[in-house]
Amino acid sequence: MAKLTVKDVELKGKKVLVRVDFNVPVKDGVITNDNRITAALPTIKYILEQGGRAILFSHLGRVKEEADKEGKSLAPVAADLAAKLGQDVKFIPGVTRGAELEAAVNALEDGQVLLVENTRFEDVDGKKESKNDPELGKYWASLGDGIFVNDAFGTAHRAHASNVGISANVEKAVAGFLLENEIAYIQEAVENPERPFVAILGGSKVSDKIGVIENLLEKADKVLIGGGMTYTFFKAQGIEIGNSLVEEDKLDVAKALLEKSNGKLILPVDSKEANAFADYTEVKYTEGEAVDPGFLGLDIGPKSIAKFDEALTGAKTVVWNGPMGVFENPDFQAGTIGVMDAIVKQPGVKSIIGGGDSAAAAINLGYADKFSWISTGGGASMELLEGKELPGLAALTEK
Protein backbone atom coordinates (compact mmCIF):
# COMPACT_ATOMS: atom_id res chain seq x y z
CA MET A 1 0.00 0.00 0.00
CA ALA A 2 1.45 3.37 -1.04
CA LYS A 3 0.19 5.12 2.11
CA LEU A 4 1.92 5.61 5.45
CA THR A 5 0.84 3.17 8.18
CA VAL A 6 0.79 3.42 11.95
CA LYS A 7 4.24 1.77 12.06
CA ASP A 8 5.74 4.66 10.05
CA VAL A 9 5.21 7.32 12.74
CA GLU A 10 6.61 8.10 16.17
CA LEU A 11 3.83 7.73 18.75
CA LYS A 12 5.48 8.06 22.17
CA GLY A 13 4.01 10.86 24.23
CA LYS A 14 1.72 11.91 21.38
CA LYS A 15 -2.02 12.43 21.49
CA VAL A 16 -2.98 10.15 18.58
CA LEU A 17 -6.38 10.57 16.91
CA VAL A 18 -7.85 7.26 15.74
CA ARG A 19 -10.95 6.68 13.59
CA VAL A 20 -12.27 3.22 14.44
CA ASP A 21 -15.46 1.51 13.32
CA PHE A 22 -17.44 0.73 16.46
CA ASN A 23 -20.77 0.78 14.61
CA VAL A 24 -21.96 -2.37 16.38
CA PRO A 25 -25.50 -3.64 17.00
CA VAL A 26 -26.77 -2.59 20.44
CA LYS A 27 -30.05 -3.85 21.88
CA ASP A 28 -31.31 -2.51 25.21
CA GLY A 29 -27.83 -1.25 26.00
CA VAL A 30 -26.19 -4.61 25.25
CA ILE A 31 -23.80 -5.16 22.32
CA THR A 32 -25.02 -8.21 20.38
CA ASN A 33 -22.00 -8.55 18.06
CA ASP A 34 -18.62 -7.10 19.08
CA ASN A 35 -16.57 -8.23 16.05
CA ARG A 36 -15.77 -4.68 14.96
CA ILE A 37 -14.45 -3.78 18.41
CA THR A 38 -12.25 -6.88 18.44
CA ALA A 39 -11.00 -6.05 14.93
CA ALA A 40 -9.76 -2.63 16.10
CA LEU A 41 -7.77 -3.95 19.07
CA PRO A 42 -4.40 -4.59 17.32
CA THR A 43 -4.10 -0.94 16.25
CA ILE A 44 -5.26 0.45 19.61
CA LYS A 45 -2.93 -1.85 21.56
CA TYR A 46 0.02 -0.97 19.33
CA ILE A 47 -0.50 2.77 19.93
CA LEU A 48 -0.70 2.23 23.69
CA GLU A 49 2.35 -0.08 23.74
CA GLN A 50 4.33 2.58 21.87
CA GLY A 51 3.45 5.10 24.58
CA GLY A 52 0.82 6.95 22.61
CA ARG A 53 -2.35 8.46 24.04
CA ALA A 54 -5.26 7.16 21.97
CA ILE A 55 -8.25 9.41 21.25
CA LEU A 56 -10.86 7.29 19.48
CA PHE A 57 -13.66 8.43 17.18
CA SER A 58 -16.58 6.34 15.88
CA HIS A 59 -20.17 6.67 14.80
CA LEU A 60 -23.00 4.38 15.91
CA GLY A 61 -26.11 4.10 13.76
CA ARG A 62 -27.83 7.04 12.11
CA VAL A 63 -28.62 10.20 14.03
CA LYS A 64 -30.61 12.91 12.24
CA GLU A 65 -32.47 14.62 15.07
CA GLU A 66 -32.25 14.92 18.84
CA ALA A 67 -34.65 12.00 19.45
CA ASP A 68 -32.38 9.68 17.44
CA LYS A 69 -29.67 9.97 20.11
CA GLU A 70 -31.69 7.63 22.32
CA GLY A 71 -29.88 4.29 22.44
CA LYS A 72 -27.04 5.55 20.20
CA SER A 73 -24.49 6.49 22.85
CA LEU A 74 -21.10 4.77 22.66
CA ALA A 75 -21.24 4.18 26.46
CA PRO A 76 -21.74 0.38 26.08
CA VAL A 77 -18.82 0.33 23.62
CA ALA A 78 -16.56 2.17 26.08
CA ALA A 79 -17.36 -0.46 28.72
CA ASP A 80 -16.79 -3.35 26.30
CA LEU A 81 -13.50 -1.86 25.07
CA ALA A 82 -12.29 -1.31 28.65
CA ALA A 83 -12.95 -4.98 29.42
CA LYS A 84 -11.10 -6.10 26.28
CA LEU A 85 -8.09 -3.84 26.93
CA GLY A 86 -8.03 -4.53 30.66
CA GLN A 87 -7.81 -0.82 31.43
CA ASP A 88 -9.96 2.26 31.91
CA VAL A 89 -11.43 3.94 28.83
CA LYS A 90 -12.26 7.57 29.46
CA PHE A 91 -15.65 8.58 28.07
CA ILE A 92 -17.94 11.57 28.53
CA PRO A 93 -21.56 10.70 27.61
CA GLY A 94 -23.14 13.03 25.08
CA VAL A 95 -19.99 15.11 24.51
CA THR A 96 -18.37 15.45 21.07
CA ARG A 97 -16.67 18.85 21.58
CA GLY A 98 -16.07 21.59 24.14
CA ALA A 99 -14.09 22.42 27.27
CA GLU A 100 -14.97 19.22 29.14
CA LEU A 101 -13.69 17.04 26.27
CA GLU A 102 -10.56 19.18 25.83
CA ALA A 103 -9.73 18.91 29.54
CA ALA A 104 -10.13 15.10 29.45
CA VAL A 105 -7.92 14.86 26.35
CA ASN A 106 -5.21 17.06 27.87
CA ALA A 107 -5.26 15.03 31.09
CA LEU A 108 -4.41 11.79 29.23
CA GLU A 109 -1.12 10.14 30.09
CA ASP A 110 0.99 7.84 27.92
CA GLY A 111 -0.78 4.52 27.31
CA GLN A 112 -4.24 5.84 28.16
CA VAL A 113 -7.41 5.81 26.02
CA LEU A 114 -10.32 8.18 25.52
CA LEU A 115 -13.38 7.45 23.40
CA VAL A 116 -15.25 10.48 22.04
CA GLU A 117 -19.05 10.19 21.99
CA ASN A 118 -20.83 9.10 18.77
CA THR A 119 -19.56 11.37 15.98
CA ARG A 120 -23.00 11.38 14.36
CA PHE A 121 -24.40 13.32 17.31
CA GLU A 122 -22.90 16.20 15.30
CA ASP A 123 -25.40 15.43 12.51
CA VAL A 124 -28.33 16.76 14.55
CA ASP A 125 -27.34 20.34 13.76
CA GLY A 126 -26.70 20.45 10.00
CA LYS A 127 -25.13 17.02 9.37
CA LYS A 128 -21.69 18.34 10.33
CA GLU A 129 -20.13 14.86 10.55
CA SER A 130 -21.72 13.27 7.47
CA LYS A 131 -21.23 16.35 5.28
CA ASN A 132 -17.58 16.75 6.34
CA ASP A 133 -18.01 20.19 7.89
CA PRO A 134 -14.55 21.84 7.59
CA GLU A 135 -14.76 23.53 10.98
CA LEU A 136 -15.59 20.25 12.74
CA GLY A 137 -12.76 18.32 11.07
CA LYS A 138 -10.35 21.11 12.01
CA TYR A 139 -11.61 21.14 15.62
CA TRP A 140 -11.26 17.39 16.09
CA ALA A 141 -7.79 17.50 14.50
CA SER A 142 -6.80 20.18 17.06
CA LEU A 143 -7.32 17.69 19.89
CA GLY A 144 -4.27 15.67 18.81
CA ASP A 145 -0.58 16.18 18.14
CA GLY A 146 -0.61 16.01 14.35
CA ILE A 147 -1.10 12.25 13.88
CA PHE A 148 -4.33 10.65 12.67
CA VAL A 149 -4.77 6.89 12.27
CA ASN A 150 -7.67 5.72 10.12
CA ASP A 151 -8.58 2.15 11.02
CA ALA A 152 -12.26 2.33 10.00
CA PHE A 153 -12.56 0.44 6.73
CA GLY A 154 -16.35 0.35 7.18
CA THR A 155 -16.56 4.13 6.57
CA ALA A 156 -13.61 4.50 4.17
CA HIS A 157 -16.03 4.96 1.25
CA ARG A 158 -17.49 8.04 2.95
CA ALA A 159 -15.97 11.52 3.18
CA HIS A 160 -16.89 12.48 6.75
CA ALA A 161 -15.42 14.99 9.20
CA SER A 162 -14.07 12.17 11.39
CA ASN A 163 -11.97 10.63 8.60
CA VAL A 164 -11.37 12.91 5.59
CA GLY A 165 -11.92 16.09 7.63
CA ILE A 166 -9.36 15.22 10.30
CA SER A 167 -6.92 13.90 7.66
CA ALA A 168 -6.88 17.31 5.95
CA ASN A 169 -5.83 19.06 9.17
CA VAL A 170 -2.98 16.92 10.51
CA GLU A 171 0.68 16.54 9.62
CA LYS A 172 0.41 12.79 9.06
CA ALA A 173 -2.70 10.71 8.31
CA VAL A 174 -1.86 7.00 8.33
CA ALA A 175 -3.56 3.61 8.02
CA GLY A 176 -4.15 1.32 10.97
CA PHE A 177 -3.59 -2.43 10.79
CA LEU A 178 -7.22 -3.31 10.02
CA LEU A 179 -7.51 -0.80 7.18
CA GLU A 180 -4.16 -1.97 5.81
CA ASN A 181 -5.26 -5.63 5.88
CA GLU A 182 -8.67 -4.91 4.34
CA ILE A 183 -7.09 -3.07 1.40
CA ALA A 184 -4.37 -5.69 0.99
CA TYR A 185 -6.77 -8.64 0.91
CA ILE A 186 -9.52 -7.19 -1.26
CA GLN A 187 -7.46 -5.07 -3.67
CA GLU A 188 -4.86 -7.82 -4.12
CA ALA A 189 -7.59 -10.37 -4.80
CA VAL A 190 -9.14 -8.23 -7.53
CA GLU A 191 -6.04 -6.65 -9.08
CA ASN A 192 -3.48 -9.44 -8.76
CA PRO A 193 -5.29 -12.72 -7.99
CA GLU A 194 -3.87 -16.19 -8.05
CA ARG A 195 -5.96 -17.93 -10.71
CA PRO A 196 -8.49 -19.36 -11.25
CA PHE A 197 -10.26 -16.36 -9.69
CA VAL A 198 -13.98 -16.89 -9.04
CA ALA A 199 -16.31 -14.14 -7.81
CA ILE A 200 -19.68 -14.96 -6.26
CA LEU A 201 -22.35 -12.28 -6.02
CA GLY A 202 -25.68 -12.65 -4.26
CA GLY A 203 -28.14 -10.38 -2.55
CA SER A 204 -31.44 -9.01 -3.74
CA LYS A 205 -30.73 -6.20 -6.19
CA VAL A 206 -28.89 -6.04 -9.50
CA SER A 207 -28.91 -2.24 -9.17
CA ASP A 208 -26.61 -2.43 -6.12
CA LYS A 209 -24.03 -4.48 -7.99
CA ILE A 210 -23.98 -3.34 -11.65
CA GLY A 211 -20.56 -1.68 -11.31
CA VAL A 212 -19.20 -4.62 -9.33
CA ILE A 213 -20.39 -7.16 -11.92
CA GLU A 214 -18.91 -5.10 -14.77
CA ASN A 215 -15.53 -4.79 -13.03
CA LEU A 216 -15.40 -8.46 -12.01
CA LEU A 217 -16.34 -9.66 -15.50
CA GLU A 218 -13.07 -8.04 -16.59
CA LYS A 219 -10.97 -9.30 -13.68
CA ALA A 220 -12.37 -12.73 -12.70
CA ASP A 221 -12.39 -16.03 -14.59
CA LYS A 222 -15.98 -16.74 -13.53
CA VAL A 223 -18.75 -14.73 -11.87
CA LEU A 224 -21.47 -16.75 -10.14
CA ILE A 225 -24.82 -15.05 -9.51
CA GLY A 226 -27.29 -16.05 -6.78
CA GLY A 227 -29.78 -14.48 -4.40
CA GLY A 228 -32.79 -12.36 -5.31
CA MET A 229 -31.07 -10.67 -8.25
CA THR A 230 -31.09 -14.03 -10.07
CA TYR A 231 -34.70 -13.42 -11.09
CA THR A 232 -33.98 -10.13 -12.84
CA PHE A 233 -31.44 -12.03 -14.97
CA PHE A 234 -33.99 -14.82 -15.54
CA LYS A 235 -36.77 -12.46 -16.61
CA ALA A 236 -34.34 -10.64 -18.92
CA GLN A 237 -34.05 -13.97 -20.79
CA GLY A 238 -37.81 -14.56 -20.89
CA ILE A 239 -37.81 -17.17 -18.10
CA GLU A 240 -40.95 -17.31 -15.92
CA ILE A 241 -40.23 -16.09 -12.37
CA GLY A 242 -43.66 -16.25 -10.70
CA ASN A 243 -43.86 -13.68 -7.89
CA SER A 244 -40.08 -13.53 -7.40
CA LEU A 245 -38.30 -10.27 -6.73
CA VAL A 246 -37.51 -8.44 -9.96
CA GLU A 247 -36.21 -5.00 -10.92
CA GLU A 248 -38.22 -4.23 -14.04
CA ASP A 249 -36.11 -1.15 -14.80
CA LYS A 250 -32.91 -3.24 -14.82
CA LEU A 251 -33.95 -5.95 -17.31
CA ASP A 252 -32.03 -4.29 -20.15
CA VAL A 253 -28.95 -3.95 -17.94
CA ALA A 254 -29.13 -7.63 -16.95
CA LYS A 255 -29.51 -8.65 -20.60
CA ALA A 256 -26.53 -6.51 -21.63
CA LEU A 257 -24.36 -7.99 -18.86
CA LEU A 258 -25.23 -11.51 -20.00
CA GLU A 259 -24.46 -10.69 -23.62
CA LYS A 260 -21.05 -9.21 -22.92
CA SER A 261 -19.99 -11.77 -20.31
CA ASN A 262 -18.57 -14.27 -22.83
CA GLY A 263 -19.92 -17.12 -20.75
CA LYS A 264 -18.19 -15.94 -17.55
CA LEU A 265 -21.52 -15.13 -15.88
CA ILE A 266 -22.96 -18.31 -14.37
CA LEU A 267 -26.57 -18.34 -13.17
CA PRO A 268 -28.51 -20.84 -11.03
CA VAL A 269 -30.43 -23.60 -12.81
CA ASP A 270 -33.10 -24.20 -10.14
CA SER A 271 -34.61 -22.57 -7.06
CA LYS A 272 -36.22 -23.37 -3.75
CA GLU A 273 -39.58 -21.63 -3.94
CA ALA A 274 -42.40 -20.81 -1.53
CA ASN A 275 -45.93 -19.51 -1.96
CA ALA A 276 -45.18 -16.47 0.25
CA PHE A 277 -42.12 -14.70 1.63
CA ALA A 278 -43.02 -15.09 5.32
CA ASP A 279 -46.28 -16.89 6.07
CA TYR A 280 -45.86 -19.59 3.44
CA THR A 281 -47.72 -22.89 3.50
CA GLU A 282 -45.82 -24.65 0.72
CA VAL A 283 -42.11 -24.95 -0.06
CA LYS A 284 -40.64 -26.95 -2.95
CA TYR A 285 -37.86 -27.08 -5.52
CA THR A 286 -38.37 -25.97 -9.11
CA GLU A 287 -37.65 -28.48 -11.87
CA GLY A 288 -35.50 -25.99 -13.78
CA GLU A 289 -35.00 -22.24 -13.88
CA ALA A 290 -38.68 -21.28 -14.13
CA VAL A 291 -40.50 -20.43 -10.90
CA ASP A 292 -44.10 -21.64 -10.64
CA PRO A 293 -47.00 -19.15 -10.85
CA GLY A 294 -47.93 -17.87 -7.39
CA PHE A 295 -44.52 -18.83 -5.97
CA LEU A 296 -41.31 -16.90 -5.42
CA GLY A 297 -37.72 -18.10 -5.43
CA LEU A 298 -36.07 -17.69 -2.02
CA ASP A 299 -32.89 -19.77 -2.41
CA ILE A 300 -30.89 -21.56 -5.08
CA GLY A 301 -31.74 -25.25 -5.46
CA PRO A 302 -29.62 -28.44 -5.25
CA LYS A 303 -28.77 -28.50 -8.98
CA SER A 304 -27.47 -24.94 -8.70
CA ILE A 305 -25.40 -25.83 -5.63
CA ALA A 306 -23.84 -28.70 -7.61
CA LYS A 307 -23.22 -26.40 -10.59
CA PHE A 308 -21.55 -23.76 -8.40
CA ASP A 309 -19.52 -26.45 -6.62
CA GLU A 310 -18.19 -27.55 -10.01
CA ALA A 311 -17.46 -23.94 -11.04
CA LEU A 312 -15.45 -23.44 -7.85
CA THR A 313 -13.36 -26.60 -8.24
CA GLY A 314 -9.68 -25.71 -8.34
CA ALA A 315 -10.25 -22.01 -7.55
CA LYS A 316 -7.26 -20.30 -5.93
CA THR A 317 -8.93 -16.93 -5.24
CA VAL A 318 -12.61 -16.52 -4.31
CA VAL A 319 -14.37 -13.26 -3.47
CA TRP A 320 -17.93 -13.62 -2.19
CA ASN A 321 -20.43 -10.82 -1.61
CA GLY A 322 -24.11 -11.51 -0.97
CA PRO A 323 -25.98 -14.63 0.22
CA MET A 324 -27.62 -17.13 -2.13
CA GLY A 325 -31.00 -16.95 -0.43
CA VAL A 326 -32.90 -15.80 2.66
CA PHE A 327 -30.28 -17.44 4.89
CA GLU A 328 -31.83 -16.08 8.12
CA ASN A 329 -34.63 -18.63 7.59
CA PRO A 330 -33.50 -22.29 7.99
CA ASP A 331 -35.78 -23.25 5.07
CA PHE A 332 -33.73 -21.10 2.69
CA GLN A 333 -30.14 -21.32 3.89
CA ALA A 334 -29.01 -24.50 2.08
CA GLY A 335 -27.77 -22.54 -0.94
CA THR A 336 -25.60 -20.23 1.14
CA ILE A 337 -24.25 -23.17 3.16
CA GLY A 338 -23.62 -25.19 -0.01
CA VAL A 339 -21.62 -22.38 -1.58
CA MET A 340 -19.61 -21.84 1.62
CA ASP A 341 -18.84 -25.57 1.72
CA ALA A 342 -17.72 -25.45 -1.91
CA ILE A 343 -15.42 -22.48 -1.23
CA VAL A 344 -13.71 -23.65 1.94
CA LYS A 345 -12.93 -27.17 0.68
CA GLN A 346 -10.71 -25.89 -2.16
CA PRO A 347 -7.05 -26.64 -1.32
CA GLY A 348 -4.93 -23.53 -0.79
CA VAL A 349 -7.72 -21.13 -1.71
CA LYS A 350 -7.59 -17.47 -0.66
CA SER A 351 -11.23 -16.88 0.31
CA ILE A 352 -12.55 -13.41 1.01
CA ILE A 353 -16.01 -12.33 2.16
CA GLY A 354 -16.94 -8.75 1.30
CA GLY A 355 -18.73 -7.84 4.51
CA GLY A 356 -22.45 -7.19 4.93
CA ASP A 357 -24.95 -10.05 4.84
CA SER A 358 -22.35 -12.55 3.60
CA ALA A 359 -20.23 -11.88 6.68
CA ALA A 360 -23.32 -12.27 8.89
CA ALA A 361 -24.12 -15.58 7.18
CA ALA A 362 -20.60 -16.94 7.70
CA ILE A 363 -20.54 -15.85 11.34
CA ASN A 364 -24.09 -17.00 12.21
CA LEU A 365 -23.73 -20.35 10.43
CA GLY A 366 -20.35 -21.17 11.98
CA TYR A 367 -18.05 -20.68 8.97
CA ALA A 368 -16.18 -17.54 10.04
CA ASP A 369 -12.89 -19.25 10.92
CA LYS A 370 -12.84 -21.19 7.64
CA PHE A 371 -12.34 -18.11 5.43
CA SER A 372 -9.05 -16.29 4.82
CA TRP A 373 -10.60 -12.87 5.41
CA ILE A 374 -14.00 -11.50 6.35
CA SER A 375 -14.29 -7.79 5.64
CA THR A 376 -15.71 -5.46 8.28
CA GLY A 377 -17.16 -3.10 5.65
CA GLY A 378 -19.97 -4.01 3.28
CA GLY A 379 -20.27 -0.72 1.38
CA ALA A 380 -16.53 -0.05 1.35
CA SER A 381 -15.68 -3.55 0.10
CA MET A 382 -18.32 -3.20 -2.64
CA GLU A 383 -16.71 0.01 -3.86
CA LEU A 384 -13.26 -1.62 -3.85
CA LEU A 385 -14.67 -4.57 -5.84
CA GLU A 386 -16.09 -2.00 -8.25
CA GLY A 387 -12.61 -0.53 -8.71
CA LYS A 388 -13.48 2.80 -7.08
CA GLU A 389 -11.13 4.93 -4.99
CA LEU A 390 -12.15 5.21 -1.33
CA PRO A 391 -12.14 8.82 0.00
CA GLY A 392 -10.97 7.74 3.47
CA LEU A 393 -7.99 5.97 1.92
CA ALA A 394 -7.20 8.67 -0.65
CA ALA A 395 -6.96 11.24 2.17
CA LEU A 396 -4.05 9.43 3.86
CA THR A 397 -0.42 10.58 3.57
CA GLU A 398 1.62 9.05 0.74
CA LYS A 399 4.72 7.06 1.67
Swiss-Prot record:
Enzyme Commission number, as recorded: 2.7.2.3
GO MF term set: ADP binding; ATP binding; phosphoglycerate kinase activity
Chain positions recorded as ATP binding sites: 209, 297, 328, 355-358
Gene Ontology CC terms, in alphabetical order: cytosol
Main location class: cytoplasm
Pfam families named among the record's database cross-references: PGK
Protein's pathway: Carbohydrate degradation; glycolysis; pyruvate from D-glyceraldehyde 3-phosphate: step 2/5
Gene3D superfamilies reported in the protein's UniProt record: Phosphoglycerate kinase, N-terminal domain
Keyword match Nucleotide-binding: yes
Class of the enzyme per the UniProt entry, highest EC level: transferase
Subcellular location: Cytoplasm
SUPFAM superfamilies: Phosphoglycerate kinase
Residues the record lists as binding substrate: 21-23, 36, 59-62, 120, 158
UniProtKB keywords: ATP-binding, Cytoplasm, Glycolysis, Kinase, Nucleotide-binding, Transferase
GO terms for biological process, alphabetical: gluconeogenesis; glycolytic process
Catalysis: reaction(s): (2R)-3-phosphoglycerate + ATP = (2R)-3-phospho-glyceroyl phosphate + ADP
Self-association and partners: Monomer.
Similarity comment: Belongs to the phosphoglycerate kinase family.
Protein name: Phosphoglycerate kinase
Species this chain originates from: Streptococcus thermophilus (strain CNRZ 1066)
Origin organism lineage: Bacteria, Bacillati, Bacillota, Bacilli, Lactobacillales
Record gene name: pgk
